[in-house]
């Protein structure tokens, strides 16, 4: 089911009725809520119509409804919103992201041609990933919106790692092919370790209770794997083909001197390491989930003028139809329950002759009242009185089944109207009654997320347990918020533990050392805790799905830089002192770390303002903040810890 809110401005009473009639003519809209006298639907120069359809927001039927509403925009000042609107991601966002990427690479690369090679390689990987998504049953809007962008920012550092290694090997070896072989060989541990930590971090999302975790985890991990294959196949070929052009287009690029930082890190290794341990301990104990909200971020025009109803659907087995009246009676005692729509309260509602006559006239079904009375008398016979009641369905079915008896009273045009009404009733009935289950649509003035809302849901659940036999289900945004508020801590802890264990194992087998994965995982987890602290300080409320998703992405992606830094240090320590190794590690890794992190921070940070969907924008912004924190820890804390545990890091290996 979908609800569409339509707001039209500057209407007089006649035009309000015209719009109402035009909306009624749109196919697949079954109910329209509007009251010319109510402040609920009229405010200043704004008029609200609430449309209901049985189809989902991403169906062809809803797309056709949106086209019809777009046509009305030509004549009226009209805006509309869906309860769960899905729009295509503009190609301009992808182009904008690649433009930002190109600018950063042009500044940071040592050749004018290198950015083009990077973009071609990652572009091919993104196209393949998007194409293989068609093999999946369904891809969510959130995944579809950010998959390409995240694949771009998560895997660009692998390309930079390989090219930087190739450049280093070229200084010692004149043969291009030999240099590339050595570059692949020496960068392989860092790239494979980095990519697999990213992949397992993303695959951890599969353990989320919500389908979006599985969806996003599969698509992004698949994208990283495809990018990895392209970086070891496509990129080396491009580099070798355009080697001469790369060196002909050589240019100056920013070089960050980290020598003083290296000296500082070694000199104050005890203070920095101790400060880190204390900081981690404090953040672990004070971290909280008060920064989390379970209500989806929204940016709605109509809600600025009209407070939207909070709809909750109760799905129950048809065998409980006799008991459902008790649930309805219970709901009517709550002042914040505005309407209760079921089969019995809509198309299945019973009317006496006067009520039914009035209702049919309102629906432009012109059946003479004498006919209505005669049908009531025929059905009820001796028991007929003014309080006798029938449903519209019963009345119309009687006329259709006995139409030969009404030949003199009902002409062909009227019979056509009756048959049309019968079809509409059947369709409307399907909205409420299925083969096994029926629904109650409860419209309330409760907020989507509040203590009062959760209390209402809790009491309604207890009432259903007492009154209904068999299975029943609740559907709605508030229901999802209610369930997640009860399970979020468990969900967060589960995802954290799974992510840490998987990444720990990958780093363990990458370095064949127990101390290294312990340090690196601890460092990045500290970045996650600091991120939560920053969000708290800024008094932000983060959508719970954003936090769950971002934690896995941060743990899997930013540890790449720590792996790169550690790998360089261990390699250099074979022939150099601690101080020289640390200086050279900074010199060799800073360009890759700085370029890659800059891409991730700026692209996600800027695109967070571009996406129309606030939830997706929020994910981008949190990634940008989290990556910034993680990079600062890697550059200013990790070196001191590495120096402190130098002997264990360099020598403590085990055989795989």
Name each region found by the language model.
Residues 2-9, 45-55, 286-295, 310-317, ...:
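Short, hydrophobic beta-strand segments
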Residues 3, 11, 31, 260, ...:
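Juxtamembrane segments of multi-pass membrane proteins
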Residues 15-111, 123, 397-505:
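Extracytoplasmic
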Residues 58, 65, 363-401, 504-508:
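Extended, charge-rich low-complexity interaction segments
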Residues 60-294, 458, 467-656:
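Membrane-embedded transmembrane helical bundles of large multi-pass transporters/channels
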Residues 305-309, 335, 422, 430-436, ...:
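A structural signal for short secondary-structure junctions
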């Amino acid at each position: 089911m979908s609800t569409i809110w339509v707001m039209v401005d500057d209407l007089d009473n006649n035009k309000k009725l015209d719009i109402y009639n035009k909306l009624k003519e749109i196919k697949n809209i079954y109910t329209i809520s509007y009251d010319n006298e109510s402040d609920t639907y009229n405010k200043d120069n704004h008029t609200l119509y609430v449309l209901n359809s049985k189809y989902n927001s991403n169906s062809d039927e809803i797309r056709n409804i949106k086209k019809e509403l777009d046509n009305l925009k030509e004549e009226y000042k009209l805006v509309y919103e869906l309860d769960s609107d899905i729009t295509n991601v503009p190609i301009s966002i992808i182009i904008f992201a690649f433009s930002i990427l190109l600018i950063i690479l042009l500044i940071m690369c040592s050749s004018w041609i290198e950015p083009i090679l990077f973009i071609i390689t990652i572009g091919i990987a993104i196209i393949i990933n998007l194409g293989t998504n068609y093999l999946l049953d369904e891809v969510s809007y959130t995944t579809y919106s950010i998959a390409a962008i995240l694949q771009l920012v998560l895997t660009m550092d692998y390309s930079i790692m390989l090219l930087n290694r190739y450049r280093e090997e070229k200084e010692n070896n004149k043969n291009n092919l030999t240099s590339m072989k050595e570059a692949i060989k020496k960068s392989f541990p860092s790239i494979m370790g980095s990519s697999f930590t990213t992949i397992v971090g993303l695959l951890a999302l599969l353990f989320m209770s919500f389908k979006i975790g599985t969806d996003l985890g599969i698509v992004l991990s698949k994208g990283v794997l495809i990018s990895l294959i392209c970086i070891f196949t496509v990129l080396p070929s491009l580099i070798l083909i355009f080697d001469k052009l790369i060196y002909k287009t050589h240019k100056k690029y920013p070089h960050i001197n980290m020598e003083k930082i290296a000296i500082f890190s070694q000199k104050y290794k005890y203070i920095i390491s101790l400060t880190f341990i204390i900081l981690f301990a404090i953040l672990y104990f004070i971290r909280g989930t008060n920064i989390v909200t379970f209500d989806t971020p929204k940016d709605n025009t109509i809600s600025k003028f009209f407070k939207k109803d909070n709809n909750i659907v109760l799905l129950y087995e048809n065998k409980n139809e006799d008991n459902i009246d008790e649930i309805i009676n219970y709901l009517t005692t709550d002042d914040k329950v505005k309407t209760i729509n079921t089969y019995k309260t809509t198309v299945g509602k019973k009317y006496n002759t006067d009520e039914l006559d009035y209702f049919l006239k309102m629906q432009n079904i012109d059946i003479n009242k004498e006919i209505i009375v005669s049908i009531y008398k025929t059905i009820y016979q001796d028991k007929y009185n003014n309080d006798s009641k029938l449903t519209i369905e019963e009345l119309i079915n009687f006329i259709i089944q006995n139409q030969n008896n009404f030949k003199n009273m009902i002409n062909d045009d009227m019979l056509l109207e009756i048959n049309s009404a019968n079809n509409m009733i059947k369709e409307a009935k399907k909205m409420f009654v299925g083969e096994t289950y029926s629904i109650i649509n409860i419209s309330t003035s409760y907020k989507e997320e509040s203590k009062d809302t959760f209390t209402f849901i809790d009491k309604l659940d207890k009432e259903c347990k007492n009154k209904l036999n068999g299975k029943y289900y609740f559907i709605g945004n508030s229901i999802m918020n209610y369930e997640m508020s009860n399970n979020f801590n468990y969900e967060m802890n589960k995802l954290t533990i799974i992510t840490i264990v998987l990444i720990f194992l990958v780093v363990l087998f990458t370095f064949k050392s127990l101390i290294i994965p312990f340090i690196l995982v601890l460092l990045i987890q500290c970045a996650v805790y600091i991120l939560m602290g920053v969000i708290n300080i800024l008094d932000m409320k983060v959508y719970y799905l954003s936090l769950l998703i971002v934690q896995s992405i941060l743990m899997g992606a930013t540890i790449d830089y720590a792996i790169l830094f550690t790998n360089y240090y261990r390699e250099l320590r074979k022939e150099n002192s601690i101080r020289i190794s640390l200086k050279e590690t900074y010199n060799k890794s800073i360009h890759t770390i700085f370029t890659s992190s800059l891409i991730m921070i700026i692209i996600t940070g800027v695109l967070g303002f571009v996406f129309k969907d606030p939830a997706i924008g929020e994910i981008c912004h949190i990634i940008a903040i989290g990556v910034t924190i993680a990079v600062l820890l890697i550059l200013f804390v990790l070196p001191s810890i590495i120096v402190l545990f130098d002997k264990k890091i360099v020598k403590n290996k085990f055989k795989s």
